[in-house]
Amino acid sequence: MTNRLKEKYTNEVVPALTEQFNYTSIMAVPKVDKIVINMGVGDAVNNSKNLDKAVAELALISGQKPLITKAKKSVAAFRLREGMPIGAKVTLRGERMFEFLDKLVTVSLPRVRDFHGVSNKAFDGRGNYTLGVKEQLIFPEINYDDVDKVRGMDIVIVTTANTDEESRELLAKLGMPFAK
């Protein structure tokens, strides 16, 4: 079973982008390479159980086991030592990536309160898009009653596009709701 968004990419987005940007080969058409979801858990310094909850929630959202990130440097002001676990991240590729992107665009983002579209200024100059989510409750897998603390996350969509314009068109054609 192929993913709905992957089929849309192959059948609609590739021909449209080829025509719009005059690519000579379909291999030159930008595609979504990977999606990285990062959740920084600052309060894991005091209580490591908070990190376990965040890891469990991230696993539910992404469908795969997160990698626990550790502090690179010691910072006395935050009572943080080098090597302490302070977050979790997941890198999605292939089928899971398309499933997550589909779910994000069609289900999760419309559930955000007062949602008027995502910013179209969050591109990094190399065709990658970064999106901040303030609460994990927008994802349908998260049960509202099981949440002990509202946590946000960063979602980075890495594309093979060379420019922000190409990347913006790719994501818009895949259904990303950019603010007008």
UniProtKB/Swiss-Prot annotation:
InterPro entries on file: Ribosomal_uL5, Ribosomal_uL5_bac-type, Ribosomal_uL5_C, Ribosomal_uL5_CS, Ribosomal_uL5_dom_sf, Ribosomal_uL5_N
GO biological process, alphabetically ordered: translation
Keyword terms, alphabetized: Ribonucleoprotein, Ribosomal protein, RNA-binding, rRNA-binding, tRNA-binding
Listed SUPFAM superfamilies: RL5-like
GO CC aspect terms: ribonucleoprotein complex; ribosome
UniProt-listed Pfam families: Ribosomal_L5, Ribosomal_L5_C
Gene Ontology terms, MF aspect: rRNA binding; structural constituent of ribosome; tRNA binding
This protein's record includes keyword Glycoprotein: no
Subunit structure: Part of the 50S ribosomal subunit; part of the 5S rRNA/L5/L18/L25 subcomplex. Contacts the 5S rRNA and the P site tRNA. Forms a bridge to the 30S subunit in the 70S ribosome.
NCBIfam families with a match to the protein in the record: PRK00010.1
Free-text function comment from the UniProt entry: This is one of the proteins that bind and probably mediate the attachment of the 5S RNA into the large ribosomal subunit, where it forms part of the central protuberance. In the 70S ribosome it contacts protein S13 of the 30S subunit (bridge B1b), connecting the 2 subunits; this bridge is implicated in subunit movement. Contacts the P site tRNA; the 5S rRNA and some of its associated proteins might help stabilize positioning of ribosome-bound tRNAs.
UniProt record similarity statement: Belongs to the universal ribosomal protein uL5 family.
Protein name per UniProt: Large ribosomal subunit protein uL5
Source organism of the structure: Lactococcus lactis subsp. cremoris (strain MG1363)
